[in-house]
Swiss-Prot record:
This is Putative Ras-related protein Rab-33. GTP binds at residues 22-29, 70-74, 131-134. GO terms for molecular function: GTP binding; GTPase activity. PANTHER family: PTHR47978. GO terms for biological process: Rab protein signal transduction. The keyword Nucleotide-binding applies. It holds the Pfam family Ras. A motif (Effector region) lies at residues 44-52. A lipid is attached at C216, C218 (S-geranylgeranyl cysteine). The keyword rRNA-binding does not apply. Belongs to the small GTPase superfamily. Rab family. Its main location: membrane. The lineage of its organism: Eukaryota, Metazoa, Chordata, Tunicata, Ascidiacea.
Amino acid sequence: MLQSGEGSPTLPKRVFKIIVIGDSDVGKTCLTYRFCTGKFPEKTEATIGVDFRERTLDIDGEQIKLQLWDTAGQERFRKSMVPHYYRNVHAVVFTYDVTKGRSFQGLPSWIEECERYSLNASEIPRILVGNKCDLKDQAEVDTNSATRFADANSMPLFETSAKADSEMGNIEAIFLTVAHKLKSQKPMMKQDYPNMKRATVLSVDKEVLRTNEAPCSC
């Protein structure tokens, strides 16, 4: 059972930090925005540091909060932030653009970076997401290749589109899969909040440096 936190008497006791990583312009911001708001942003600002959103879920009667850290894909923007956003991570969502083969070819370097910070597959749930599947006629990464890569790295694969309204259920399934994997684990962060009727979507200004508005890469 998957629900948003609306109508719940309290916010969850268990909080999980999930980082969404991958090359620049693969649609990480739109993916997290779609999951947290149910909408596709017509415009977004390029993430230079870290953008932060969260959503409260009801998983089998237990309230769980997912904190989604959307990280910059460009190396020159990430160097000073890397130690910070890899701290206390509970799960990783690796993202590539199905229309850009280079973003898929770059996945091993993202996996290596995670392992340098001790985010090993045996300890940290990992998910592989191929975004922009609404542009299948422009695809440079076929499903079979992505499946082989996911299997080799012990990750489930989801192909979806943050832009297509019809894909909302698939996007929910991505994070529901993560939530179920995390539900049975010992929480690393605990919080006690006053009563609050709905989940919130937050942006941490101190962690985010932004450029001017630009069209979103879905």
